């Protein structure tokens, strides 16, 4: 039985999630909530500067949009509590506005009748379970939680990488740097921002800033709590990022042993290993959370290791959002079947 979903927010992640969800037979997209007219949403779904022309036909209609004959209702209400999730029988709301990334705010969707909510970003507080596929998705708990967070794109990258290294060799400590493509949190031209470096034009500079990825990692991989720290460098490219992770391991290793650990990891669809000498544009629209650049793996002093992992911070992340939504829906169905027996 397909899971009924609604998407709140039609920004970069909301639109990518919609594209991917419409290709997943386990999901039934019933509604989107956005402040733009259907003509605008249809156009931005059909034509995307980063990910190309959509392979489906999206048309604006009076009630919303139609995608290859599938009608999706367009709502436009900034207050989630007013949305008709109960009457539409919505199982999972994918919260993609970035404005409700706190359990106390996201609960408005539950109050409106949705069964569960999945945030497309790290939670800023409240009763929320953070899930990273390939790290702790086997612990997804719909009995205890109504609201879930898919963490950040960077946490989805570093999570599987750190898990493999820690499980196989043991991590003593380490530092990470994410070299991250620009996002709409930055400014095209110099303008005020609470982070004075992000106030500067994103197209002109490499911009050092903070990342919560290493800190958030402890929520999904508690074994590394207090062992990793990091920062971000925002660079003037439109998409695809990388994590540069340097760790001291408990065991002595070789480059081959490190790369083999990633190749042999049971993380199909989440983590991949690339042996060709590629650059960032080659990973555009790659669905994995992390792609190890095997040619860049280094070992010094037998146990100090440097690993580079690429990730499409839009498309890879949006694939994980859809997959976690599917898993939440399956658990809802399983629970309903048990009750019916």
Curated annotation (Swiss-Prot):
**Keyword annotations for this protein?**
Cytoplasm, Glycolysis, NAD, Nucleotide-binding, Oxidoreductase
List the catalysed reactions: D-glyceraldehyde 3-phosphate + phosphate + NAD(+) = (2R)-3-phospho-glyceroyl phosphate + NADH + H(+)
Active-site positions, per UniProt?
153
Q: Which GO biological process annotations does it have? A: glucose metabolic process; glycolytic process
Pathway, per record: Carbohydrate degradation; glycolysis; pyruvate from D-glyceraldehyde 3-phosphate: step 1/5
Q: What does this protein do?
A: Catalyzes the oxidative phosphorylation of glyceraldehyde 3-phosphate (G3P) to 1,3-bisphosphoglycerate (BPG) using the cofactor NAD. The first reaction step involves the formation of a hemiacetal intermediate between G3P and a cysteine residue, and this hemiacetal intermediate is then oxidized to a thioester, with concomitant reduction of NAD to NADH. The reduced NADH is then exchanged with the second NAD, and the thioester is attacked by a nucleophilic inorganic phosphate to produce BPG.
Q: How does it assemble?
A: Homotetramer.
Location in the cell reads: Cytoplasm
* EC code(s) of this entry: 1.2.1.12
- State where NAD(+) binds: 12-13, 78, 120, 184, 313
Q: Pinpoint the site Activates thiol group during catalysis.
A: 180
Name any one Pfam family assigned in the record: Gp_dh_N
InterPro entries xref list: GlycerAld/Erythrose_P_DH, GlycerAld_3-P_DH_AS, GlycerAld_3-P_DH_cat, GlycerAld_3-P_DH_NAD(P)-bd, Glyceraldehyde-3-P_DH_1, NAD(P)-bd_dom_sf
Protein name as catalogued: Glyceraldehyde-3-phosphate dehydrogenase 2
Name a GO molecular-function annotation: NADP binding
